[in-house]
Amino acid sequence: MAKKKVKYTFDYDSKFLNEHNVKKLAYELTHDSDTSNKILDCLFTAEVTDEQIAEATGIKLNFVRKILYKFYDVGMANYTRKKDPETQWFTYYWRFDSRKAAQILEKQYNHHNQEIKESIEYEENNMFFVCPNGCRYPFDEATEFQFICPRCNEKLEFKDNSDLIHDLKKLESAYKINE
């Protein structure tokens, strides 16, 4: 029997929320894309219990709970606790939190984007010198070492970094989100 594709719909509007980004975030938390994707599929289907997720996915209950708690710890999943009047046991109903996931993704995006910008600025504002073994130093350090590599005692030669700057700018433009 063919598995039905789950449609990821979000109750919060954000340029960062899409199925790819959510699955990537889940993988970063769990380092297990197959399992986390199955659990996410359940969370996007309805508000579900951990037992229902385990039954639907075939994943052991304790492993389902472990991943749900990882999602909960960062805020991308929440639960409602309800007490069974007969057994007096609590049942936890889990759901995906679109708003918090969007905030996490936006924070990650801003962090990575800032790192790229800082790298471009650093590369544009410095000249670099390398030894035959690939050790790389900015001009200030190279002059301190009298253009001799402190690691291998080889001569440091100027290295044009315009290709690296070009690649970083390409990465920066590819990383921008359409607004």
Curated annotation (Swiss-Prot):
Leader sequence range is none
PROSITE patterns per UniProt:
HTH_TFE_IIE
This protein's superkingdom? Archaea
Report keywords, A-Z. DNA-binding, Transcription, Transcription regulation
In the record's own words, the domains note is: The winged helix domain is involved in binding to DNA in the preinitiation complex.
Function of this protein?
Answer: Transcription factor that plays a role in the activation of archaeal genes transcribed by RNA polymerase. Facilitates transcription initiation by enhancing TATA-box recognition by TATA-box-binding protein (Tbp), and transcription factor B (Tfb) and RNA polymerase recruitment. Not absolutely required for transcription in vitro, but particularly important in cases where Tbp or Tfb function is not optimal. It dynamically alters the nucleic acid-binding properties of RNA polymerases by stabilizing the initiation complex and destabilizing elongation complexes.
List, alphabetically, the NCBIfam families matched: PRK06266.1 (NF004910), transcription factor E (TIGR00373)
Record's family? Belongs to the TFE family.
Q: How does it assemble?
A: Monomer. Interaction with RNA polymerase subunits RpoF and RpoE is necessary for Tfe stimulatory transcription activity. Able to interact with Tbp and RNA polymerase in the absence of DNA promoter. Interacts both with the preinitiation and elongation complexes.
- What this protein is called in its record is Transcription factor E
Native organism is: Methanosphaera stadtmanae (strain ATCC 43021 / DSM 3091 / JCM 11832 / MCB-3)
Q: What is the lineage of its organism?
A: Archaea, Methanobacteriati, Methanobacteriota, Methanomada group, Methanobacteria
